[in-house]
Structure formats: C-alpha cells, structure tokens
A protein has these predicted regions:
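Polytopic membrane enzymes that build or remodel cell-surface glycoconjugates and lipids
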Residues: 1-186
C-alpha cells in the first residue's frame, strides 16, 4: 500500500544533479572499459613505465622541479600528472590495467562534471544530454586510452570544476579562491 518508489521518493528526483551526472559517468566507464586490456604504447613507455623517478620512493620530489619527460629538453612541466603516475606505481606496482582504470575513472568524473555544469546553466535535460555527449564523444579516445593523455583529462577536470564553482551565484570570496585554485592546478 503506497510503497516507496523512485517516482514518489521525496529524496530522489529525476532532475537531481546526481541523477543527471551518474548516467554520463556510467556511460564513460562502459565505453572505455575495453582499454583495461591496453598496454604501454609510445610515450607511455617513457613517462608511465620506464621513468626512473616512478620506481624511486622519493621520486615524487623530482617531479616538483624537473620536466615531464626524463632527460628531455622541451621544458614541459606537468607535476600533477606525473605525481598521479608515481602514486599509482607506489600503490599498484604499475599494473597496466590499473593505470588505464584511473584514466577511465577520471574521464567518468569529468563527464559527470560536464553534466553538472550544463544542468546548472541550462537545466536537467541539457545536463543529461551534455554529459552523455561528452562521455561518448570520440575526441576523448586518445586522452583516455593513451596513458599520458591523463594530462588532458586532469586539465579538463580542473577547468570544468572551476567553471562549476563559478556558475554558482553569487560568487563569494571563498568560491573565487576555489576557482583560482582550480585554474592554477589545471
């Protein structure tokens, strides 16, 4: 008699931000799960497999001041990306499928953030559509399947998270600091 269903539950609404963001995250995981069988390719070998700093317990310090690629002269500096690879090596021993799983989870998180941002700016339907399109767009294949593409995914996460914070009205000092910090990290 009058059981609780998703349709009548007061704590669950179809337009709730989590209800909008979750399908995008699930789709991202489903679409890219096949990459769990991937191996190290191209720059993955230099940056996410053979970099001696990955295998040194104190190697994280070198990422704070040294370049992205070992012994390179290009001056790329991506400490957040490098530190995620270092941490994963320390925690998982560099098992390839786990490195790929992190890229998939990061893409799922960014897809959910895109859905949440579109939901905030244009409503529930727009959020759902934007999140699903972002999750499934083929442009992201390289960033998710190629391990070093993590740099782009982390950048997108910082930018979209900052925009999401900024989209809240009014923009308080605390939120402004959060937006600035997100932009710096990105």
């Amino acid at each position: 008699v009058g059981g609780v269903t998703l349709a009548n539950c007061k704590t669950w609404r179809r337009d709730h931000p989590l209800a909008i963001a979750a399908p995008a995250a699930v789709l991202a995981v489903a679409l890219y799960a096949i990459t769990l069988r991937g191996t190290f390719i191209w720059d993955d070998r230099f940056i996410a497999q053979d970099d001696p700093r990955l295998h040194d317990a104190s190697g994280w310090r070198a990422y704070l001041h040294a370049g992205y690629r070992p012994n390179a002269v290009d001056n790329l500096w991506r400490p957040l990306t490098s530190l995620t690879f270092w941490a994963q090596w320390r925690l998982t021993g560099g098992i390839t499928w786990r490195l790929h799983a992190m890229n998939i989870l990061l893409h799922a998180a960014v897809s959910a953030l895109v859905a949440a941002l579109a939901h905030r700016l244009a409503g529930a339907r727009a959020g759902l559509i934007a999140g699903l399109l972002f999750a499934a767009h083929p442009l992201h294949v390289e960033a998710v399947a190629y391990l070093v593409g993590r740099a782009e995914t982390l950048c997108a996460a910082g930018v979209v998270a900052a925009l999401l914070v900024m989209a809240r009205r009014p923009l308080t000092v605390g939120r402004a600091v959060g937006v600035f910090a997100g932009a710096i990290v990105a």
